[in-house]
Amino acid sequence: MHNIRPHKLFNLVHSASYLERMVQVVLPDKESPVVFDTAILLALAKVVRPRTIFEFGTYIGVQTLNLAVNFPETKIYTLDLDEASLQGLQQDPSDKPLTERHLKYQTQLAFLNTPYEKRITRLYGDSNKYDFSGLANQMDLIYIDGGHDPVTLDSDTKNAFKMISQGNAGCIAWHDHGNPLYPHIPEYLGKLSDSRQLFHIEESWTTFFLQNSEGLVALLKS
């Protein structure tokens, strides 16, 4: 695992002016992600310039909206549980209130009834059982922030590596690395880093992998 300072990533975002570096984000409240991790995700997206994005864990749709607003040409897929797929599901105890909130917000997700909704495809189901075969080798950016239990984390990670584009620059980003509610995540990603070059942004909850980006990886390690 490579632990890097935030500027290492932000310096990879090349722009002709500060105006081009501007982004729009939803100001956080108690339900939405902190701005720092959102800025990291948007920087990763600016680096790889995704045509397609897949999000594990829609939650209330704020991060989905952040991505849609800042990348107007990008198609976004977002997956989360519905009432049917929740039946009999074994979740991490800390995920249960998040799922309850997600289901409560079904008709109030952040991107609904906005100009960006038409570029967002909502998918429903348990990601451990979902058939991702139709999305293989099609996603340029994958954001893993769904079920945090070890089984789901491993399943989502393996499916992410199947979905990531093989012929283009791509990125897989994991959220909640360092979240005290999920102490097993650093250990899991640490073991994964034995076979994959992973980067953790210090002072954040984000770890990422870059695909077909040897030059960028070298800069991050320098």
Task: Please give the residue ranges for each predicted region.
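Class I SAM-dependent methyltransferase Rossmann-like catalytic core
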Residues: 7-48
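S-adenosylmethionine/decaboxylated-SAM
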Residues: 25-27, 39-222
